[in-house]
Every structure is written in C-alpha cells, then in structure tokens.
C-alpha cells in the first residue's frame, strides 16, 4: 500500500515512518522525495483545519493515501499565542531559533513571568485517494522554561517541558519523545484508521489475484 507523509521535515518523517512500520508493509514516501512540490498556504485557525488543508491537497496531487499533521503551541498568559502563528511567530521566513527567541522575549514582558504554563494541540489526518478524511487529536500540557535546553527535536522543543518530565522535548531521547509527545499521541489515536485502510488494501489485492 502506497502512503505519503505530507511533510518535508526530517524529524516528522522519521517519526511517522516508525509508526507506519509497526502496522504493516507500506510503500512509504514523503515530500522530501519531491523538493519541487509546493504545499498549500496554511490559512486555518486550528491544527485540524491546517492538517486537512495539507492532507487533502497532497492526496489529490499524488492520488494516494496521505498522512498530514499540524500542531500549535498555546500559552494562556500570552492570550493563546503563538497559536496559529506557531510556525511564523517572528516572521514567515524566520528560523525556529528566531521564533524561540521572540517567545522568550514575550514571556519576559508578562505581568506575572512565573506563569509559564503552555500546551501543544495537534491534529493528524489520514486522507484517502478519493478525499475521505480520518482525523485524530491530542494535546500535551507543560511549561515554558527560562532558556533553551537540549539540542534534539525542532521548533519549540528546547523551550517546552512536558508535565511529569524534568527535561524539555529537546533533552528527551528521540525514542522517548516519540512515545509521549502530542504528535505521538495523535498518531496512536489514528492507528485504527490506518490499520483499516491497510486491511482493505490487502483484501482488495487478494480478491484481484
């Protein structure tokens, strides 16, 4: 069964490949294999809206099953920021490090800088070649630390410490983060839909023999 990971981000691709390999033998490819591909502009207000935009567009383009995701970091003390601006907090073409720098600067301006609670919201979707959408949501609560810690991961990982863990996402071993992160939890909820699609694929293939 051919399946596309609608991402060109190496970390996300590795995580999703590992997830799929636990389910069955897929012909897996990603947007890393198509550097000329231009994804749609993310205009959604929520992770679900953005994930669906990315997933449906890619499924229509490549005519195959597609997995897409979107996440937002929400900090109540900042009025919900960065929220839908998570990927462009300090500018559309700025780096992850630039976004983290701006976030720490914004946290310094808080009336109560001790209130550093935050959470990630994530949606992962599975889209069929015909546009049928299956979706799963998850979130992770934590805090924003006072300075960057750790060198792995991406995005806001060096600043986000999940509740029940002393380390930031960027300090956790990749195999641990891939079990406890918001994306990992959403993928786990999506698993029954992926298994169903794979089983239907095997059934159709056997009937054609």
UniProtKB/Swiss-Prot annotation:
The name of this protein is dITP/XTP pyrophosphatase
Q: Which GO terms describe its biological process?
A: nucleotide metabolic process; purine nucleoside triphosphate catabolic process
SUPFAM superfamilies (alphabetical):
ITPase-like
Q: How does it assemble?
A: Homodimer.
- Reaction catalysed by this chain? XTP + H2O = XMP + diphosphate + H(+); dITP + H2O = dIMP + diphosphate + H(+); ITP + H2O = IMP + diphosphate + H(+)
Q: Which residues form the active site?
A: 70
Q: What is its EC number?
A: 3.6.1.66
Which Pfam families does the record associate with it? Ham1p_like
Q: Which cofactor does it need?
A: Mg(2+)
Task: Tell me which residues bind substrate.
Answer: 7-12, 71, 154-157, 177, 182-183
All disulfide bonds of the chain are none
Role played: Pyrophosphatase that catalyzes the hydrolysis of nucleoside triphosphates to their monophosphate derivatives, with a high preference for the non-canonical purine nucleotides XTP (xanthosine triphosphate), dITP (deoxyinosine triphosphate) and ITP. Seems to function as a house-cleaning enzyme that removes non-canonical purine nucleotides from the nucleotide pool, thus preventing their incorporation into DNA/RNA and avoiding chromosomal lesions.
Q: Which domain of life is it from?
A: Bacteria
Q: Which GO terms fall under molecular function for this chain's record?
A: dITP diphosphatase activity; ITP diphosphatase activity; metal ion binding; nucleotide binding; ribonucleoside triphosphate phosphatase activity; XTP diphosphatase activity
Binding positions for Mg(2+) per the UniProt entry: 70
Q: How is the cofactor bound?
A: Binds 1 Mg(2+) ion per subunit.
Q: Where are the transmembrane segments?
A: none
**InterPro entries xref list:** dITP/XTP_pyrophosphatase, ITPase-like_fam, RdgB/HAM1
One GO location term (cellular component)? cytosol
Q: Which family does it belong to?
A: Belongs to the HAM1 NTPase family.
Q: Which UniProt keywords apply?
A: Hydrolase, Magnesium, Metal-binding, Nucleotide metabolism, Nucleotide-binding
């Amino acid at each position: 069964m051919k399946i596309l990971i609608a991402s060109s981000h190496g970390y996300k691709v590795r995580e999703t490949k590992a997830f799929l390999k636990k389910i069955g033998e897929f012909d897996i490819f990603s947007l890393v294999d198509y550097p000329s591909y231009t994804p749609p502009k993310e205009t959604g207000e929520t992770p679900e809206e953005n994930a669906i935009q990315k997933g449906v567009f890619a499924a229509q383009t490549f005519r195959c099953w597609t997995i897409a995701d979107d996440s937002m970091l929400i900090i109540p003390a900042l009025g919900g920021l960065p929220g839908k601006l998570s990927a462009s907090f300090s500018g559309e073409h700025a780096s992850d490090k630039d976004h983290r720098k701006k976030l720490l600067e914004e946290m310094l301006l808080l009336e109560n800088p001790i209130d550093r609670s935050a959470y990630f919201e994530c949606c992962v979707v599975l889209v069929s070649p015909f546009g049928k959408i299956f979706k799963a949501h998850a979130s992770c609560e934590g805090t924003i630390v006072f300075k960057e810690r750790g060198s792995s991961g991406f995005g806001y990982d060096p600043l986000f410490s999940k509740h029940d863990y002393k380390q930031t996402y960027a300090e956790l071993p990749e195999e641990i983060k891939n079990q406890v992160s918001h994306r990992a939890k959403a993928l786990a909820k999506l698993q029954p839909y992926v298994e169903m699609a794979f089983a239907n694929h095997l059934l159709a293939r056997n009937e054609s023999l």
